[in-house]
Regions:
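Alpha-helical packing segments of well-folded alpha/beta enzyme cores
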Residues: 2-3
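Cytochrome P450 fold signature focused on the C-terminal beta-domain
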Residues: 13-23
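Conserved C-terminal structural/oligomerization subdomain of aldehyde/semialdehyde dehydrogenase
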Residues: 23-163
Length: 163
């Protein structure tokens, strides 16, 4: 369990979603919002990609350090930065190697019609799962060129035209 692993490795469990009780679904298997703070790059919850309502916060003193750990990570699904500095935000947007980027938002997931997906080890094959890429993934395109003249007589190597 990632929540137990994060806590045992020393991350500060700020919000624990393990004991959530949803009225009408008492026997369900749910995890509520979970937030870890003071996560370091040697922790399992940093190294592995966790899907679900689990957020890991890595606090760093220098912008370049943040860019390095993000861009050197094997996964690249989503990341966020909190700043009031527009120059840093633009630098982050331009240079971070991540598929979904948030500026002053906790989870950089827009509406479902946008392509979902990250870069590097976070991508689902060659396509995202939402938006135009998702439609193209589930669509098999075929191009058919056809001509049905009334009389076909002789041989012609000319491209047919509409006359």
């Amino acid at each position: 369990n990632y929540i137990e692993k994060g806590a045992s490795e020393g991350a500060a469990l700020e919000m624990d979603g393990r004991n959530i009780n949803l009225q009408g679904f008492e026997n369900g298997n749910f995890i509520g919002p979970t937030i870890f703070n003071n996560v370091s790059t040697d922790m399992t919850i940093y190294k592995e990609e966790i899907f679900g309502p689990v957020l890991s916060v890595v606090n760093l003193d220098h912008f370049d350090d943040a860019m390095n750990i993000i861009n050197n990570h094997e996964f690249g699904n989503g990341t966020s930065i909190y700043t009031s500095n527009g120059t840093l935000a633009r630098n982050f947007m331009k240079n971070v190697q991540i598929g979904m980027v948030g500026i002053n938002v906790p989870i950089p997931v827009p509406m479902a019609f946008y392509s979902f997906g990250g870069w590097k080890g976070s991508i689902f094959g060659g396509h995202g799962m939402h938006g135009e890429e998702g439609i193209n993934f589930y669509t098999k395109r075929k191009t058919i060129t056809s001509r049905w003249p009334e009389d076909v007589a002789g041989t012609s190597l000319n491209m047919p035209t509409m006359k």
